[in-house]
Each structure stands twice: as C-alpha cells, then as structure tokens.
Regions:
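Conserved structural core of kinase catalytic domains
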Residues: 121-176, 234-241, 246
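Protein kinase catalytic-loop region centered on the HRD/HxD motif
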Residues: 186-197
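Glycine-rich ATP phosphate-binding loop
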Residues: 63-90, 156
Length: 385
C-alpha cells in the first residue's frame, strides 16, 4: 500500500487504478489518492486529523439542515456542515465501516478541492455527533471557499434551486448557463473517474457562494454538495438506500423510484447521469423541476372533464413528460447540441450502462464513462453564445 502511495509516475498510477476494478478495492483507492497528490496538496491520511472534535465548533445547529458556522484550530475558519443521519449501534463493526466510508469521502473531497474541474468544497474532516437526538448524525465539514474579511459582509450560500426561483436575481445569460452545465457535467465525470457515486444530485445540492451585500452572485462557479448517500462503486461498500422524498424523487431514475425496484435495484452510474439530465433541463428552461411538475399537474386538471374528480398524477407519467416534451422544448432555447446531451442523460445512458448478459457490470460502467465524456462533457464544451 505504501509503495503505491509513493508512486509518482501518472501512467503507472492509471494502470493500477484500472487494475483495481478487478483487484482489491484498497489498491484502487491508494492509486486514486496518489494520483490526486501529484497535482494537489498533501492529503491528511491520518484518521485523527479528519475526526474533528465537537468543542472546536462555535455552534452546530439543532436539526439536519445544512449549517454555516465557525471552526477553530489555531485560526478561526468559516465552515459549512452537511449532516448525514445514521441509526447504527455504537461501537459496532457496522459503525466503523460507515465512518470509514465517510472518512474516505472526506479524503477524496479534500484532495480534489485543488482541482477546479471537480467543483467540490475543501472537506476539513468529519464530526461524529453522537449527542444529537433522536439519532446520531455525522457531519462533513467544508471550508467556505471565499476569504472572510472581519470588516466585510458575511459569506452567503445559496443553491441552484434558490438561484432559479429568486425573483430578485437576474436570469443569467445564455453563455453563463452553458458554462454552468459544462462545469456540472465535468464535475460528475471527475467523480466517476474517482470511482464514486453521488446518488443525490438535485438543484438543492448545487451550491453558490457570494459576499455581495444584496446576495447576488454568478452561476458559473457551482459546487457539488449533498453527499448524503455517496459511496465508492465497490460492491463491498456499505450502501444507504435513499428514502422516498417527493422533491428528490423528481431527479431520480425511474428504476430508483418505482415501488417494485427502488429498495432492491443496485445503484449504477447511469442513475447519476439521469439526475444530471434533469438538472440540465432546469438550466436550459431556467425553471425548477418542482415548478414544472406543478404546472404539469395543473395542465392535467384543466384537461379533465369539468366537475369530475381529478385522479392523482403518478410520478411515472411526469417522468415520461420530462423525457419527451421538456427535452423537445430545449432545442429552441439551448440548441441541438445541448438538447442531444440531455437526451443522452435521460435515454442513451441507460443503454450504455445497461446490465445485459453480453456485457458485464464493470465493462458496462466503463463504457458509460467513456460515452458520457464523449457525448455529454465534450459536446457541452462546444456550446457557445
């Protein structure tokens, strides 16, 4: 393991990473960390460095909401905490496994923060808050990405969902929306290359930061967040099934929301790609998917016979609407290249990453990464205004 960490030849590291698909996960993880070390600051591999003490935080908040506070370790640092709830017996093997996954994620996010294309925040470590009730929670602690001036305005964080819905914010021009889409697609590809799943992409997990007094900001500097369910793509890893949630389910692949499969289907990269496709629809229309859903239900109600009882609109019906009519509406707004990239995310990705008897899961996933880079990342790079 130490020999791999010390390896400095990027080509050799890439070979080891590929071999790690079939060999032990630890080899692949070590090669990934070493590859990041070649272009970033040293990774704090010590668990003690990453397990942050509760007493050093100014406050922690009373619920599971994303929380901005200060962390003191020699100097005062403005931080953002994202919480993950867990119901695991203390001092159990299961808890050790779970915390190790959180620590691996913290290492990855710390190492990748110096690589702009990852679009992730610098993760300082994790906080295991066993005092929280009714269940324990673990927090991923991120450094706020803007310098804090004691006399300047405070840093404000807002989401892509806020950005689209806030009336006081001007709609970004077309070139900025192209750049936003391109940055998000590239970030997801980099996450795939690091052999991780995100599992919770949605507009509330795309963050922006500003120190402007009026709270305005640019949309071209997004940060991926919301790694509640994130894990490495190894089948040996502990996995948490996302709970049913009306907002999040609008971004999830139909197989992840159907009652017959949502609790049993193994997670695949194509599910993250599908979620990106929904984000690209929102960026293209500059309209949140929950607003689109509300309008869709209103259309159905209006079309129903007057005085009749309107049946609930199933999610599957809305998902078909997103993949058809909403995608078709993009060509006028964003052009053919952008629209085809969205089509890949919502349609072609399922075929490229499908599990068929002739294609192993590993080979299918690798093919998907290659096609995603070619048909989405590279194509979005061609979009200009």
């Amino acid at each position: 393991m130490q020999a791999i960490i010390a390896e400095s030849d990027p080509n050799r590291l890439l070979e080891i990473q590929r071999a790690g698909v079939h060999w032990r996960k630890a080899i692949s993880v070590a090669a990934s960390v070493a590859a990041l070390q070649q272009v970033s600051t040293p990774v704090p591999l010590s668990t003690n460095q990453l397990m942050l003490p509760r007493a050093r935080f100014a406050s922690l908040g009373q619920d599971m909401a994303r929380y901005q506070t200060q962390y003191t370790h020699g100097e005062v640092t403005e931080v953002l905490i994202e919480w993950r709830a867990y119901k695991i017996p203390p001092n159990s093997e299961t808890k050790i496994t779970y915390l190790n996954t959180c620590l691996d994620l913290a290492r990855l996010l710390h190492a990748s923060q110096n690589l702009e294309t990852y679009r992730t925040l610098d993760c300082l470590g994790i906080l295991d808050d066993v005092e929280f009730q009714p269940h324990s929670r673990v927090g991923l602690v991120y450094r706020v990405p803007l310098a804090i001036s004691p006399t300047g305005p405070p840093v404000k964080v807002f989401t892509l969902h806020d950005f689209i819905n806030r009336k006081e914010l001007a709609r970004p021009p077309l070139d900025e929306r192209f750049e936003l889409a391109r940055n998000l697609a590239t970030a997801l590809h980099r996450l795939f290359a690091s052999r991780w799943y995100h599992k919770n992409l949605n507009s509330k997990n795309i963050l922006f930061f500003t120190q402007a007094v009026d709270g305005t900001g640019s949309c071209i500097q997004p940060y991926l967040s919301g790694f509640d369910y994130a894990r490495p793509d190894s089948p040996d890893e502990m996995t948490l099934k996302p709970e049913a949630d009306e907002f999040c389910d609008r971004y999830r692949h139909p197989q992840c929301t159907h009652p017959d499969s949502r609790s049993t289907i193994p997670f695949r990269r194509r599910f993250d790609v599908y979620s990106l496709g929904i984000l690209l629809i929102e960026i293209g229309r500059w309209e949140t998917v929950d607003r689109i859903h509300k309008d869709y239900i209103a259309q159905k109600a209006k079309a129903a016979a007057k005085g009749s009882v309107v049946a609930p609109v199933p999610l599957e019906s809305f998902q078909r609407y997103l993949r058809t009519r909403c995608v078709e509406s993009l060509a006028f707004r964003m052009g053919t290249i952008y629209t085809n990239a969205v089509k890949f995310c919502l349609h072609d990705a399922t075929e490229a990453g499908g599990d068929t008897p002739a294609v192993s899961v590993v080979d299918g996933e690798q093919e998907l990464i290659s096609r995603f880079n070619r048909d989405v990342v590279a194509e979005l790079a061609k979009c200009t205004a």
